[in-house]
Amino acid sequence: MDLPGPIHDFLLVFLGSGLLVGGLGVVLLPNPIFSAFSLGFVLVCISLLYILSNSHFVAAAQLLIYVGAINVLIIFAVMFMNDSEYSTDFNLWTVGNGITSLVCTTILFLLMSTILDTSWYGVIWTTKLNQILEQDLISNSQQIGIHLSTDFFLPFELISIILLVALIGAISVARQ
């Protein structure tokens, strides 16, 4: 970001102190859930530091991968492994589970009907890709997005499916 010097320095000190406080929270808090949330705060501060240094794509990847996936997985693992006093009142099926399954099933059928009803023959995947990439107005993150949606579309989707299967397997192993 193009900020004036004093504002840039203030944000740098503010984010650095946030990193220190969050790191101390990860190490010193006795509750593992609070430590995991503190780790999420640290990762968000790191992402904001990347934004401050004009690395927007790295900041977005940091948020999506570390905060959105890994930190949530750590919180799930801690919640599954933590023996709490509420584990004796475990109900196999609750109202929230029914509502969630109804919403997910509705979204699944809406997506399936939309995909089946769409005429895919008129869709043009690329329009003069080389001319778009040669423009000076396009940023690096847009170039990465164009490559991911054209050249590397199939490998990107296959990797996402493999990661989804691994996540489901890890959760099912953790529950047993």
Swiss-Prot record:
Keywords: Chloroplast, Membrane, NAD, NADP, Plastid, Plastoquinone, Quinone, Thylakoid, Translocase, Transmembrane, Transmembrane helix, Transport. It is found in: Plastid, Chloroplast thylakoid membrane. It catalyses: a plastoquinone + NADH + (n+1) H(+)(in) = a plastoquinol + NAD(+) + n H(+)(out); a plastoquinone + NADPH + (n+1) H(+)(in) = a plastoquinol + NADP(+) + n H(+)(out). The chain crosses the membrane at residues 10-30, 32-52, 61-81, 92-112, 152-172. It is a multi-pass membrane protein. GO terms for molecular function: NADH dehydrogenase (ubiquinone) activity; quinone binding. InterPro entries: NAD(P)H-Q_Oxidoreduct_6 (IPR050290), NADH_UbQ/plastoQ_OxRdtase_su6 (IPR001457), Nuo/plastoQ_OxRdtase_6_NuoJ (IPR042106). Its EC number is 7.1.1.-. Its main location: plastid. It is an enzyme of class 7 (translocase). It comes from the Eukaryota. One of its GO terms (cellular component) is chloroplast thylakoid membrane. Belongs to the complex I subunit 6 family. NDH is composed of at least 16 different subunits, 5 of which are encoded in the nucleus. NDH shuttles electrons from NAD(P)H:plastoquinone, via FMN and iron-sulfur (Fe-S) centers, to quinones in the photosynthetic chain and possibly in a chloroplast respiratory chain. The immediate electron acceptor for the enzyme in this species is believed to be plastoquinone. Couples the redox reaction to proton translocation, and thus conserves the redox energy in a proton gradient. This is NAD(P)H-quinone oxidoreductase subunit 6, chloroplastic. It comes from Capsella bursa-pastoris. The lineage of its organism: Eukaryota, Viridiplantae, Streptophyta, Embryophyta, Tracheophyta.
